[in-house]
Amino acid sequence: MTNIRKTHPLLKIVNHSLIDLPTPSNISAWWNFGSLLGLCLIIQILTGLFLAMHYTSDTLTAFSSVTHICRDVNYGWLIRYLHANGASMFFICLYMHVGRGIYYGSYTYLETWNIGIILLFAVMATAFMGYVLPWGQMSFWGATVITNLLSAIPYIGSTLVEWIWGGFSVDKATLTRFFAFHFILPFIIAALVMVHLLFLHETGSNNPSGIPSDSDKIPFHPYYTIKDALGFLALILLLLLLVLFSPDLLGDPDNYTPANPLNTTPHIKPEWYFLFAYAILRSIPNKLGGVLALVMSILVLAIIPLLHMSKQRSMMFRPISQILFWVLVADLLTLTWIGGQPVEHPFITIGQVASILYFTIILILMPLASLIENKILKW
């Protein structure tokens, strides 16, 4: 008798995706982040669902309802902080996952890569709208500043902003619609994840060497199920350390002050995971230029496959590209630091230099390094 997992229509899909999936035998811990992102998404949807049961999306009661969740709901504080810090873990895993894709040349799987970019935008949009919901000072002013950027779009800008706001300022209508979108988007993300995996399983996983591994595949279960389980354990440990010991470490104290349209916070800044993009936005003294640079800081990922000049797929055997990659990582950390600093003398210049360097490395230096490495191969 054939095993039910190989014949049952539903179990067959699970079997081909998680059990009998042929997987390269040499993929490293950098390949754990895909499954960790899946875990993060599940954690966020579950904690978010329980928060939505107690939250009210009204300007008068939103802040109080979050306080009520933390004080009066059973383990409400835990659910709230798991959700808030879960978002941070989500972005750590996201950036690691994208970094892995760039380093090992996974972007040559075009469909998988492009769906991944769409997923990145969707997660960023969801996180932004979620940050507005507690209706603290930083929520309100963050929403005002970021939505206002759309007014830089020629001709339709102002109309578009008022349409998104549902009025002439960020108010009740804005909060209500942001809550609606924040609730629905994770499910759209989950659907996109399925498409992402569908395209990935068409080609199979890449591996650190970048060399086709069809001749050396092993079943996903038990080898990678146990490896993923270890990753899950590490992620949950890290998340619980954050939630139980310093839940507000990554948050902003301004968000413990209820939103007040008459009082602007001195330093408006987004959550830490958007600071690099915010620094790029601020480093251009022109509104439209800044917005374009902001969008391009993520969209540049879509151009990376077109700029792949190397004869090798992975950076494993390409020392010049490796150095550039780690300089890019250092540059992104610098931008993250600058994004959290006030707009004054040394920080403005550092931000501008770091922004130029970011685009220069990706668009010019990396393709050049690839061509040099191709030449070295012939020696």
Curated annotation (Swiss-Prot):
Transmembrane segments: 33-53, 77-98, 113-133, 178-198, 226-246, 288-308, 320-340, 347-367
CDD domains: cytochrome_b_C (cd00290), Cytochrome_b_N (cd00284)
Residues reported in the UniProt entry to bind a ubiquinone: 201
Cofactor note: Binds 2 heme b groups non-covalently.
Cofactors (names): heme b
Keyword terms of this UniProt record: Electron transport, Heme, Iron, Membrane, Metal-binding, Mitochondrion, Mitochondrion inner membrane, Respiratory chain, Transmembrane, Transmembrane helix, Transport, Ubiquinone
PROSITE patterns: CYTB_CTER (PS51003), CYTB_NTER (PS51002)
Annotated positions binding heme b b566: 97, 196
InterPro entries membership: Cyt_b/b6_C, Cyt_b/b6_C_sf, Cyt_b/b6_N, Cytb/b6-like_sf, Cytochrome_b, Cytochrome_b_C_euk/bac, Cytochrome_b_N_euk/bac, Di-haem_cyt_TM
One Gene Ontology molecular-function label: metal ion binding
Superkingdom classification of source: Eukaryota
Residues the record lists as binding heme b b562: 83, 182
Subcellular location: Mitochondrion inner membrane
Gene Ontology cellular-component annotations: mitochondrial inner membrane; respiratory chain complex III
One GO biological process term: mitochondrial electron transport, ubiquinol to cytochrome c
Membrane topology: Multi-pass membrane protein
Purpose of the protein: Component of the ubiquinol-cytochrome c reductase complex (complex III or cytochrome b-c1 complex) that is part of the mitochondrial respiratory chain. The b-c1 complex mediates electron transfer from ubiquinol to cytochrome c. Contributes to the generation of a proton gradient across the mitochondrial membrane that is then used for ATP synthesis.
Extra remark beyond the main annotation: Heme 1 (or BL or b562) is low-potential and absorbs at about 562 nm, and heme 2 (or BH or b566) is high-potential and absorbs at about 566 nm.
Subunit-level organization: The cytochrome bc1 complex contains 11 subunits: 3 respiratory subunits (MT-CYB, CYC1 and UQCRFS1), 2 core proteins (UQCRC1 and UQCRC2) and 6 low-molecular weight proteins (UQCRH/QCR6, UQCRB/QCR7, UQCRQ/QCR8, UQCR10/QCR9, UQCR11/QCR10 and a cleavage product of UQCRFS1). This cytochrome bc1 complex then forms a dimer.
Stated family: Belongs to the cytochrome b family.
Protein name: Cytochrome b
The organism of origin for this protein: Sylvilagus palustris
